[in-house]
UniProtKB/Swiss-Prot annotation:
Name listed for the protein in its UniProt record: UDP-N-acetylglucosamine--N-acetylmuramyl-(pentapeptide) pyrophosphoryl-undecaprenol N-acetylglucosamine transferase
Functional summary from the UniProt entry: Cell wall formation. Catalyzes the transfer of a GlcNAc subunit on undecaprenyl-pyrophosphoryl-MurNAc-pentapeptide (lipid intermediate I) to form undecaprenyl-pyrophosphoryl-MurNAc-(pentapeptide)GlcNAc (lipid intermediate II).
Principal EC category: transferase
UniProt organism field: Buchnera aphidicola subsp. Acyrthosiphon pisum (strain 5A)
Membrane keyword on record: yes
Amino acid sequence: MIPKKIIIMAGGSGGHVFPGLTIARYLIEKGWLVNWIGTKNSIESRIIPTYGIKIHYISIKGLRNTSLKNLIISPIYILRAYYAVKKIIKTWSPDIVLGMGGYVSGPGGVASWNCNIPLLLHEQNKIAGITNKWLSRISTKNMQASPGVLRNAEVVGNPVCQSIIKVPNPINRFKNRTGLLRVLVIGGSQGSSILNRILPKVSFLLKEKIIFWHQTGNYELEKTKKKYNKLRLNQNLITSFIKNIASAYEWADLIICRSGALTVSEISIVGLGAIFIPYPHKDKQQHRNAEDLELIGAAKIIDQSNLNTKLIVNILNSLDRDKLFIMAKKAHSLGVRDAIFNIFNVINKISKKT
């Protein structure tokens, strides 16, 4: 039997890459051949090859907050990327092309449509990105994590890796847990400067109450470590990137983080109370992602413009492990744990028509 082939397009941020990687790994288990399209010097270039997946690099940049110069020359990059992906499609002949959103998906989405290859889209956020909005007009099938985001889209949830789904539920995690409150700090796959600046001060003021596991991102690891060391806070674990995020979720009583779609989905699946500091996008997509958890009392949302040391300290002082256990159970009630199966069913169904 000839194996099916798929090209997955995702890059720029963990929010696009990791859901795509979860889909890729599941498809490989099912006997599919997978190629990837991304950009050099982004997270996908460091992550995807380690899983034995062939990645093709295109030169393309996002247009959000870009300079006037880049905006003027962007059509040249888009055309080059389009022809590069078209050549890959002609050479490899995939059965399906899957776009996970973000600027990487744009040229490839148009190329797959032009080559009459079924184009599938997946939107992770509660507000669709520009690329997915445009491509949804020409795509074969649209998928979305939440209702009402893309036109004529099937609700499938956000795919997360099995290690996260297998994290023990809040009842088992919190049972007999004692000691300092365990706070996981994650500013997204690339870290967050504002969290790296504020959280060491918070740790100093609450060193008798909490312990941090802090993901800083690659660029600010040493600077953030120095802040903690200067305050003689040696009990905290400071790292640039947490590869085994499931173990971190299992360890934590609470998470302080951005509210990217994948992070919110993972927190719901695991069941973990959260303090969200949404990245201040103009469309407030991260704020929207977190609203359901705040509404049921599983999370608190702080706009970045209001964030300061005193506010975080006051919130943490108002919490104890019993309250965090209640927040965790509420979060757990919203978890969508069958997204990968839903997505595979859609992909498999479309592939049988080719």
